[in-house]
């Protein structure tokens, strides 16, 4: 029999789900975008699984920074654009200057207006804003209605796989 989760457990499961959905959504978005941009499929990221950790971080930032704004689409859009734009700029810069890794470079891509050092561009920032509105207005309300024991177990299993994949491919390598 399914035991109801308490509020803390619900929040943990929801946050893990947001992280996973955002990471997978980012992988799908980039796979489609680079197929269009380059004309062939490219496996994005260094993980084995179909997820990109920077999008997981972005999704979590969007959720945490917009909890109180969840009914204000304009605030969600602006907040998500700024938060994720800064995340992408800072992470891109640090990866290049500390680890000597460049995971993205908007200098060579289509629709790269407003490009800042290849780290961010207007297209990506606008996409993050729209993604934030989609996450807060559609995804979060939908997944909060779906909670049950099977989904909770699946969330934990996928969360552990995501963490293992991240640790092996970003930290240990």
Q: Residues of each region from the PLM?
A:
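Aromatic-rich, lipid-facing transmembrane alpha helices and their immediate juxtamembrane interface loops
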Residues: 1-173
């Amino acid at each position: 029999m399914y035991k109801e989760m308490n509020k803390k457990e619900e929040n943990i499961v929801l946050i893990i789900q947001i992280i996973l959905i955002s990471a997978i959504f980012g992988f799908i978005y980039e796979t489609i975008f680079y197929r269009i941009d380059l004309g062939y499929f490219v496996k994005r990221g260094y993980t084995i699984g179909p997820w990109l950790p920077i999008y997981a971080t972005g999704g979590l930032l969007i959720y945490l920074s917009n909890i109180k704004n969840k009914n204000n689409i304009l605030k969600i859009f602006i907040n998500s654009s700024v938060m994720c734009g800064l995340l992408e700029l800072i992470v891109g810069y640090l990866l290049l200057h500390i680890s000597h890794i460049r995971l993205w470079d908007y200098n060579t891509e289509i629709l790269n207006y407003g490009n800042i050092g290849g780290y961010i561009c207007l297209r990506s920032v606008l996409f993050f804003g729209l993604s934030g509105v989609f996450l807060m207005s559609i995804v979060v309300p939908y997944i909060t209605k779906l909670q049950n024991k099977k989904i909770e177990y699946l969330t934990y299993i996928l969360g552990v796989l995501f963490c293992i994949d991240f640790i092996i491919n970003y930290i240990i390598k």
